[in-house]
């Protein structure tokens, strides 16, 4: 019984995100980018583990950041994630997420869904783990075999090495602004 509720908690977080994504797609014309962003922000903040994600993407450079820089990076990554969802999930024509499976993965879970959009099938694998608050949270999203965390890790570490912390944050902010402008 405990195992089922454990897997259910992990899956429930994914369902919470997906329900929000379907909602913003269905109401995309009414919400526009800003409305989609505002609707998603509290949900994304609740279901993703941005403290963990920040540590992973910074890797060996994480200890070099002070507490304020860490918090700022976590907030920037959260805003970037929300802006990406708000930009990409901007119209609805019957798309749906279909549950595939949940399996144990080390101390975490891998929750798989298939996104049906017309004839396209896109696999979303959500790597879940227990966050510091004891809740299941999304640590990584793998879309058709491509890990978002791996992509960001390489990109952000390279930016940090070349431009320093302020350059990295400035770049993330520019990405957020670009997504907002592209959605107008």
Question: What residues fall within each predicted segment?
Answer:
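Short beta-strand edge/turn micro-motifs at domain boundaries
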Residues: 121-151
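Intrinsically disordered, low-complexity linear regions
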Residues: 39-42, 49, 53, 104, ...
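Soluble periplasmic/extracytoplasmic beta-strand elements of cell-envelope proteins
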Residues: 15, 20-24, 98, 112-114, ...
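A mature extracytoplasmic/lumenal domain signature
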Residues: 77, 101-103, 114-117, 128-130, ...
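Early exported N-terminus immediately downstream of N-terminal targeting peptides
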Residues: 7-85
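Surface-exposed, charged secondary-structure patches
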Residues: 83-125, 172-184
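Low-complexity, intrinsically disordered terminal/linker segments enriched in charged
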Residues: 143-184
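Short, low-structural-confidence N-terminal segments
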Residues: 1-6, 184
């Amino acid at each position: 019984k405990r195992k089922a509720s454990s897997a259910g908690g992990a899956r429930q977080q994914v369902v919470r995100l997906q329900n929000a994504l379907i909602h913003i797609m269905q109401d995309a014309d009414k919400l526009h980018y800003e409305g989609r962003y505002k609707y998603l922000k509290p949900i994304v903040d609740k279901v993703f583990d941005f403290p963990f994600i920040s540590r992973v993407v910074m890797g060996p450079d994480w200890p070099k950041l002070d507490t304020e820089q860490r918090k700022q990076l976590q907030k920037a990554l959260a805003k970037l994630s929300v802006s990406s969802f708000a930009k990409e999930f901007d119209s609805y024509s019957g798309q749906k997420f279909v549950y595939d499976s949940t399996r144990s993965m080390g101390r975490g879970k891998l929750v798989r869904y298939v996104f049906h959009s017309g004839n396209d099938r896109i696999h979303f694998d959500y790597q879940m783990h227990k966050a510091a608050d004891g809740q299941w949270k999304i640590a990584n999203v793998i879309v058709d075999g491509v890990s978002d965390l791996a992509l960001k890790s390489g990109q952000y570490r390279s930016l940090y090495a070349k431009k320093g912390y302020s350059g990295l944050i400035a770049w993330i902010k520019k990405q957020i602004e670009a997504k907002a402008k592209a959605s107008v």
